[in-house]
Amino acid sequence: MSDERYQQRQQRVKEKVDARVAQAQDERGIIIVFTGNGKGKTTAAFGTATRAVGHGKKVGVVQFIKGTWPNGERNLLEPHGVEFQVMATGFTWDTQNRESDTAACREVWQHAKRMLADSSLDMVLLDELTYMVAYDYLPLEEVVQALNERPHQQTVIITGRGCHRDILELADTVSELRPVKHAFDAGVKAQIGIDY
């Protein structure tokens, strides 16, 4: 490709991008969903949260399912004022106790609702929330109501497989991660600093 053709192509791209940027005038918080069966939902969410903290934004995190074991995200972000609330039972496939899992979910959900009502929080990350709805630990209607009633400027990030269609419809941005290849399938153990 000649330099002239390259410049012309890039100019067309610039015009399209500039037109889209000019159309985007609404300033408000958004709902972002990272879903699908591929790796990287939590990683993408925490990358966005880290970016927000780097710009001086106030962020709160609620982790469903993952338990209280240490993880790199928490080690990095808590010293920067990010509040973490974690479902105490951990992986529900380990506990296999619906009653205690539901109670633990409801307890940490109270913190999530508090954060979703807190106008001082610029962002709330609800890691693995989709499972709580899918497993009927939380009523969908209650989750949707809390999302709808949050402060206007607050952004919410939701992660997890199998996101309910009502939450997908409510979301402004949805990314579905698709598995192509995963080291775990080849027998490679989850690695500190990579997977948690």
From Swiss-Prot:
The gene is btuR. Its EC number is 2.5.1.17. One of its GO terms (molecular function) is corrinoid adenosyltransferase activity. ATP binds at G36, N37, G38, K39, G40, K41, T42. Belongs to the Cob(I)alamin adenosyltransferase family. It is found in: Cytoplasm. Gene3D superfamilies: P-loop containing nucleotide triphosphate hydrolases (3.40.50.300). Pathway: Cofactor biosynthesis; adenosylcobalamin biosynthesis; adenosylcobalamin from cob(II)yrinate a,c-diamide: step 2/7. InterPro entries: CblAdoTrfase_CobA (IPR003724), Co_AT_N_dom (IPR025826), P-loop_NTPase (IPR027417). The lineage of its organism: Bacteria, Pseudomonadati, Pseudomonadota, Gammaproteobacteria, Enterobacterales. This is Corrinoid adenosyltransferase. It is an enzyme of class 2 (transferase). It catalyses: 2 cob(II)yrinate a,c diamide + reduced [electron-transfer flavoprotein] + 2 ATP = 2 adenosylcob(III)yrinate a,c-diamide + 2 triphosphate + oxidized [electron-transfer flavoprotein] + 3 H(+); 2 cob(II)alamin + reduced [electron-transfer flavoprotein] + 2 ATP = 2 adenosylcob(III)alamin + 2 triphosphate + oxidized [electron-transfer flavoprotein] + 3 H(+). It comes from Escherichia coli (strain K12). GO terms for cellular component: cytoplasm. CDD domains: CobA_ACA. Keywords: ATP-binding, Cobalamin biosynthesis, Cytoplasm, Nucleotide-binding, Porphyrin biosynthesis, Transferase. One of its GO terms (biological process) is porphyrin-containing compound biosynthetic process. Required for both de novo synthesis of the corrin ring for the assimilation of exogenous corrinoids. Participates in the adenosylation of a variety of incomplete and complete corrinoids. Pfam families: Co_AT_N (PF12557), CobA_CobO_BtuR (PF02572).
